[in-house]
Amino acid sequence: FAKADLLRDLVTAFNLTESHAARMAMDPVAVGHLLIDRGIEPIVQMTSRDKNRLAIQASILGAAALGVSNVVFMGGDPPKNGDHPDAKPVFDLFASQLLEAACALNNGTDLTGNALKGTPQLTIGAVANPGASDLETEIDNMKRKADAGAEFFQTQAIYDVGAFDQFMNKAKPERPVLGGIIPIKSVKMAQYMNDKIPGVDIPQALINKIDAAGDDKAKVADISIEIAGSTVRALGDITSGVHIMAIGWEDKIPAILDRASN
């Protein structure tokens, strides 16, 4: 919990992924409960990759019982891309159906209409990809998710603020949007993300800046922090906030936020 304690006075909440990239990790609901015990607000991700509709509803109710009230729903990464490639994917519900399930539980019934004894009080989130190859479909998906109960959105990583601004002007989302930030740790990482992660397009100009630092790790980190900080600053007038996916660089977040404010 050292990283959480380091950042607790700088951020509103901590995002907890559910076996991100299909790599096995502790259940985020359990981690979220432990953070709540430390006075830290969690945002828990839930996917349909590993659970059918019975298990998803049980997890939502379990999260609520443990005090977790912020949940972001998504499909999840296919198991074949993770560290357990033989795991069977479930994907019983689509993303909008996950939201409908959470909304139904919030309103006092399960997906089949059975009444609950008590109701959770969840703030329901969804994801959006402003770099999707088919923006019209992505915008339609955002509207569908909002209609299904999404109260806020988190986006894929943003590197071209101008293109993102155009997306927002076209989408005109009626829910708060948190722009995604992933610091560029290396040229290799940037190239991997451009090749493997749908919707991520790191401009060559940014890659060249990182490349110019050569093998000087401190200089690479400083350039990356400057890029991330300037992106956070630029998003200030476009989004309702940001979510920084530091991927092991959580100790760099204070510097990123400092650059963003200067």
Predicted regions and their residues:
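Active-site-adjacent beta->alpha loops and helix N-cap segments on the catalytic face
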Residues: 22-34, 52-59, 78-115, 135-137, ...
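A generic, well-ordered mixed alpha/beta core segment in the N-terminal half of proteins
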Residues: 44-48, 52-79
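Conserved, mostly hydrophobic/aromatic
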Residues: 14, 63, 145, 149, ...
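Conserved N-terminal beta1-alpha1 strand-loop-helix module at the mouth
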Residues: 1-13, 145
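C-terminal amphipathic alpha-helical "assembly" element
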Residues: 217-262
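Catalytic beta/alpha-barrel core
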Residues: 13-24, 46-47, 72-73, 151-159, ...
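Structural motif
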Residues: 9, 66, 148, 237-238
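Active-site pocket-lining/capping segments in soluble small-molecule metabolic enzymes
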Residues: 2, 89-112, 116-117, 127-132, ...
